[in-house]
Structures are given as C-alpha cells and as structure tokens.
Amino acid sequence: MGEQINLHSFRKEVDSTYVGFTPNGGSIKPVHVASGVQRCIYGGYNTTMQIKRLALVSDAKGNVPAGSELETIYSALAENETIEDGITEGAVESMRNVMQRLLSADKGVYVVKGLKDDMISFTAGSKYFLTRTSIYEDTGEFIGGLIRSYCPQLAEYIKALLDKANDPISLLFEPVLESSMQVFEKSRHEDLPAFKVPNDAVKWYLKGLNESGLCLMQNLKQHPNTLTQLRLFNFFCIFQLIRYMALLEAFYCGENIRPVLLDFSGMAPSQSSVARASEMAYTQMHKSINRFYAWGYAQKLKEKDYSKEALLESETPVYDEKKKASVELDTLWALAKERARACTTDDEVRLVFGETMYDMLALEASSHPVNCLKILGTSAGALYPPDKMHPNKRFVLSQDILEMILRSTVSPDEILSGSDMRNRLWERFGIIVGGSTYELEKLQNSGMLLQIDEDSLERNFTSF
C-alpha cells in the first residue's frame, strides 16, 4: 500500500504548477488584490511602520496594538514637531480614526501583540503605502505580473501614478512617510505551462487583457483624481482574475470559453429568462473550476505513479498530517473506489479520484477556489445578490464595475455602433449582453441549454 495522500499538499502543488497563486476565499478583499498588484507593478515595497502606528487605532477585537497607544503617538508627533501647539490628544485620536477608515487598514487581522511589517493592506495610492507580501495578496501579485508582461504601457502608467504620491491621502500622511524601498521582482505566471506554450484560449485572453488595458489607460489619463484611477484599475484587475479562474479549464483541458452574461433585466430569476441564464453562466464557471481542479489532482496522481491498483488499495486521504480521516472522507473515498473499478484505463481512474479529492477538500476547507471567485465578485460588485443567504449568483454589475467595463471598451471621444460594442465586450472580457444571433450562438456553444430568445437578449441590451 502506497503513502497516504495528503490533500492539502496536493492542493498546494496544483496551485503552484498550474494556477500561479492560491485562490483561497475565506477573508480575501479587494484591498488584498490592490496591494499585491501595486507591489508587483511598482517592483518594490516600503517600510510602513510609522503609517501603521499612526493609522492602526485598533484591531478587529477593539484592542490597541502595542506601540500604537494614543499617548505614544502624541508624544512622538510632538517630539518630531509634526503637530502644532494647541492640538489636543482628543483631536489627534479623532484624526487617527479617520485615517484608519481612509486606508481601510485591515481590521480582520489581529495585531495586538506587536506591529509587524506585514498582515496589513492599504487602499492608499502611492509608493509609500506598498507593503511586503502577506496572506491573500498572491492573487494581486499574479494579475499584476500578467499586466506588467502583456500590457506594459498600463503597468508603467500605474507605476508613475504611485511614484507621484500627490493624492490627498499621501499628503495627509506626509509627516510620517518613510522612503526605504525594497525590491520586488516576482512574476508568478512565467513558469506556468499555460503561458509557456499558450493555446488559442490563452492567446485570446491575453489579447483581450492587452486591448482592454490600453483602452482603460487612455480613459484614466483623462481623469483628474489619482485615487479614483487606482480604484478603477483595481476593479479591472479583479474582473480579470475572475475571468482567469473561469478559463483555467479552457487553458489546460481545451474546453469551451465560459461567457459572462450580464443581467440588466432588473428582475428575479423566477421572472426573467435573462436573469436565469446569467445565474446559469455563473454556475457553469463554478463547475468549470471544479473540473479543472479534478484534472489537476489527476495529473499529480499520474506524476506520482498512482495506478488503478494502487489507488484501489490506498488509504483514505487526510487533509493534513495533524488530522485523521473523518467518516465523511472514508465514505467519499469508498464511493470513488466503487466508481473506479468500472474504469478501463489508469487515466480514467485518476480522474475519478481527482474529482473525489476536490470534493474532500471542499468539505474540509472553507477556503476553496470557488469561494475566492464568489467573495471577490460580490465584494467588488460584479455578482448579485451580495449576501451569503443566496449561493446562486448572477452577473449584475455595480456602477463602479460597469464604469470600468465601459472605460475599458470605449476610448475617449470614440463612438461605437451596437454591433461594435457587442464585439468588443466579448473579445476583451468574454461578456455577453444580448441583441444578436451571434451572442445567442456563443451562449449555446458554451453548452448552456437555455429557454432564452433573441428578443429577451435584445431587451437586455437596450437596458444596458
């Protein structure tokens, strides 16, 4: 009997070999994406200790981190002559609370034992707020590396914005800003098979990334507010991350492109065929991610020379070495063995067990890949409803996301026909809104069996 399978180890290997980051969902926020993207594009990070001491008033439990007490902060400001005489401790404390909200300093992190130069993410818009790598930020580093490689003009523009540091938040913190940059040169995508030998789906995705990024850059240059520009850019990165995850099966297994059907019906799925179809498009993305990971686990089983005989004789896998296999895992593994006995090839057997390993990981760990897509999508305003009570989502865009999509599709002073608009939305984002036979065919070619007609899609496009 072979070595017992460690599910957590297999997951890390699949993410490292094929994905480029670990799409964990538990507490990921848009600010984590922003921090990773900006660090990667700028090519460095800063020591932000003084910013943290000033702005991090309390952690998620209301505790005051060591070194961040009001008396300590006030004394330091007075000693360095960075506040005027007559400003009270109460006034400083009020300003610090405003600063924490401005930065969105992550109150989900417990830092009461000491201020370390990690585990805090900022939404501010300059090089002085770039921090070293921390949890959940590898997603941003990944998409930042893609943009730097495949849309370098946009990356250079964002880097220049960060370098100027002339936004209101940077000016507010100017008395405590530090300049001690450390180099960051990681590119997470370069060693992935999908980018070493790209297939047509990868080339299509990267072409859309480049074209939409250049168009967005042209529009950002017309906008006077640096922070708004960076906010729109972060929404762009989040949407591209969602698309990337949904396309992994197409990148590695040659499957169909999964379309993003936007719902502008304004009605519930029970009342609108477009809303139902958008919900189905989201469900298809979930299933596509599931199948990709099942394939990935099967590939790893093959690398480790697991044959049909070895898998049929194997013990139930454990999530990690510290945990024993539960009754639920025993049952799932036994069912996999029953299915595998009917398979005729080792590859078929490994895929059966790969599917089961994915199900086991979903059962054992809350932070599995589809949660990452769902949480990022809802928090950024790309998916609706935003609450946890409705697991079935559909693509109903917030005004911010819609603005980003439009600014990435239509250049300044450009006028597009409806046909050109539909074509660009598909080529740049894989988006379908409706209004043509072409789009209906795209939905049908993706494998969606829908009770939806051209008239419903046309009304959806009119609402758009």
Predicted regions, residues:
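Long, internal scaffold/assembly segments composed of regular secondary structure
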Residues: 207-335
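Long, low-complexity, charged/polar intrinsically disordered regions in eukaryotic proteins
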Residues: 313-396
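Positively charged, polyanion-binding regions of nucleic-acid-associated proteins
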Residues: 396-414
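Short amphipathic alpha-helical interaction segments
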Residues: 430-445
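Charged low-complexity interaction tracts in eukaryotic proteins
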Residues: 374-400, 441-464
